[in-house]
């Protein structure tokens, strides 16, 4: 008879920044909970397809995996630099944001401290709920390598699903990729370049920071290639870096946003969109504009920008991706423009009912009958990031770590900004939900969070008017 796997307290699916931060929070809180993490990749990696020169992160370096939760943590970015012998050199760079490559090394460094808790090369195929009178309700996870795990609580953190806009999402080809696969796709095209009877031609779709960084990287790394940036807007837009809008990354704003009505949430997301989406930092915008100007001075057009452009169609033809594009600024359509590679820097899917969202991540399909849904068929998420269950269902905690922008605001939009504090909230919630294992644990909070907005910022008697 086949032995059942042992029942553990917490199983984390995915070991990227979100669950790495959770592992650190559990350890530093002296948690008695037994936690195991499953990661599909052979090692801890953060966005390996985007680690090229000239790219950086877009949050303050102190908003790392731990510092907002515990400024004294040994897992901070500052301590990483110190232990690598690069602290003073890094400070001397004068960079507003760290290089993406160095921050990826930092993420891997923190992950290396939890090797004993991680099962690498374990891609999760299924997650299901189990009713067990002897052990109580729990979850069973099966991986593609044949391994199975049982846990009383599960924290799902696979990263957000890449979004490819129509009509590109319907093409089954390795020549259309999301930005997360940019470098591998570029390497494949380089290997094939000698067999092409034309200069390599690459399109970069989208108006994000990553889109601009990829355009600049291609211009530097492959001068022979023809590169076209395709954006719906008149021009690449400057990111909103106002300190006032930056308060969306204050911890108290999460509570404010979570408690807002659906209509108010939609309004806030529209207002705050330029803080994180379809916009770029001034330094890369200036570099791109200067590069385009230099090309005009030299009489070359190997780097182009198609502005006010709508994708009308896409197809495979003659081994290339052929795009039909409407140039609204010129009042004309560009039909049949062929590319050897199309990179979509078009963001990720959030939880929601619209075309660019998803109602439920694929990993949760096996437990969907247990989950409470809203009127539009989307997951209902608690303030502690736990998924709400259908009435009458009894189960352990099932938590979303990093997929809750629609319910919790911009701090959950794939940014590091509130990642450490989210891990703190989840760790505390797991202790409450799994009381037997956590009975002996009294973990003091490293940071006391103030209400938002600060009372001092409000006129006398106005505190009641802040609720949304």
Segments and roles (model prediction):
Residues 46-54:
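N-terminal beta-loop-helix "entrance" segment that forms/cooperates
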Residues 56-89, 254-264:
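Flavin (FAD/FMN) cofactor-binding and adjacent substrate-gating region
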Residues 52, 79-81, 244:
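Short, flexible, mixed-charge acidic loops at enzyme active sites
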Residues 1-42, 46, 90-209, 213-468:
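Flavin (primarily FAD) cofactor-binding/catalytic cores of flavoenzymes
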């Amino acid at each position: 008879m086949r032995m059942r796997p042992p029942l553990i307290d917490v199983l984390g699916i995915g070991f990227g920044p979100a669950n790495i931060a959770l592992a650190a929070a559990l350890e530093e809180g002296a948690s008695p909970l037994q936690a195991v993490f499953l990661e599909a990749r052979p090692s801890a990696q953060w966005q390996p397809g985007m680690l090229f020169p000239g790219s950086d992160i877009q949050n303050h370096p102190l908003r790392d995996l731990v510092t907002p939760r515990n400024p004294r943590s040994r897992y901070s970015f500052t301590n990483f630099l110190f232990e690598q012998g690069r602290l003073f050199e890094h400070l001397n760079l004068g960079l507003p944001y760290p290089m993406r490559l160095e921050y990826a090394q930092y993420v891997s460094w923190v992950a290396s401290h939890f090797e004993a808790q991680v099962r690498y090369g374990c891609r999760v195929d299924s997650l299901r709920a189990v009713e067990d009178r002897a052990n109580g309700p729990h979850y069973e996870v099966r991986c593609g390598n044949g391994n199975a795990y049982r846990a009383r609580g599960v924290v799902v953190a696979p990263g957000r699903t890449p979004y490819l806009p129509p009509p590109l999402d319907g093409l089954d080809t390795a020549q259309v990729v999301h930005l997360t696969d940019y470098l591998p796709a570029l390497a494949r095209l380089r290997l094939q370049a000698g067999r092409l009877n034309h200069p390599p031609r690459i399109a970069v779709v989208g108006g994000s920071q990553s889109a601009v960084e990829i355009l600049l990287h291609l211009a530097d790394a492959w001068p022979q290639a023809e590169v076209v940036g395709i954006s719906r807007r008149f021009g690449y837009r400057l990111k909103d870096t106002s300190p006032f809008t930056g308060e969306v990354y204050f911890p108290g704003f999460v509570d404010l946003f979570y408690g807002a009505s659906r209509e108010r949430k939609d309004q806030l997301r529209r207002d705050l969109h330029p803080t994180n989406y379809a916009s770029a930092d001034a330094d890369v915008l200036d570099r791109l504009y200067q590069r385009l100007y230099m090309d005009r001075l030299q009489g070359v057009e190997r780097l182009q920008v198609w502005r006010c452009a709508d994708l009308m169609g896409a197809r495979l033809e003659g081994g290339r991706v052929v795009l039909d594009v409407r140039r609204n600024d010129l009042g004309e359509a560009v039909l049949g423009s062929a590319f050897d590679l199309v990179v979509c820097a078009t963001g990720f899917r959030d939880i929601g009912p619209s075309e660019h969202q998803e109602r439920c991540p694929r990993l949760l399909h096996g437990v969907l009958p247990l989950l409470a849904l809203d009127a539009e068929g989307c997951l209902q998420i608690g303030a502690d990031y736990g998924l709400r269950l259908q009435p009458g269902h009894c189960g352990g905690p099932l938590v979303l770590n990093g997929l809750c922008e629609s319910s919790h605001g911009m701090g959950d939009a794939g940014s590091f900004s509130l990642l450490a504090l989210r891990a703190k909230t989840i760790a505390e919630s797991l202790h409450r939900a799994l009381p037997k294992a956590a009975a002996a644990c009294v973990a003091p909070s490293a940071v006391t969070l103030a209400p938002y907005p600060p009372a001092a910022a409000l006129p006398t008697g106005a505190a009641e008017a802040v609720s949304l």
